[in-house]
Amino acid sequence: MTEVKTFMVKGAALFNESEFPVRQSFTKYVRALNEEQAKEKVYMDLGSKNKIKRRNITFLEIKEVDPSTVKEKRIKELSKIDKIIL
């Protein structure tokens, strides 16, 4: 059985491409099984919330971190869950 890990993803994205483009850096913490799934989660989040195209997102660093060092409450709560009943 695979274990879900916490990843810190740092990168930059081009916000507001059509009107006044601004490149902004970001740091997101996500829960995923591996680095590829962590990248996909960031693509989905930034694309759905900010309408950013995948080609406008660049990743600078993706690394696994200890869940206790993360400051986001949502990620801390998700890391405490040990099983899900469907």
Swiss-Prot record:
Gene Ontology terms: cellular component: ribonucleoprotein complex; ribosome
Paired cysteines (S-S): none
One example of a Gene Ontology biological process annotation: translation
GO MF annotation terms: large ribosomal subunit rRNA binding; structural constituent of ribosome
Recorded superkingdom: Archaea
Ribonucleoprotein among keywords: yes
Acetylation as UniProt keyword: no
Keywords for this protein: Ribonucleoprotein, Ribosomal protein, RNA-binding, rRNA-binding
Homology family: Belongs to the eukaryotic ribosomal protein eL20 family.
Subunit: Part of the 50S ribosomal subunit. Binds 23S rRNA.
Full protein name: Large ribosomal subunit protein eL20
Organism: Metallosphaera sedula (strain ATCC 51363 / DSM 5348 / JCM 9185 / NBRC 15509 / TH2)
Gene: rpl18a
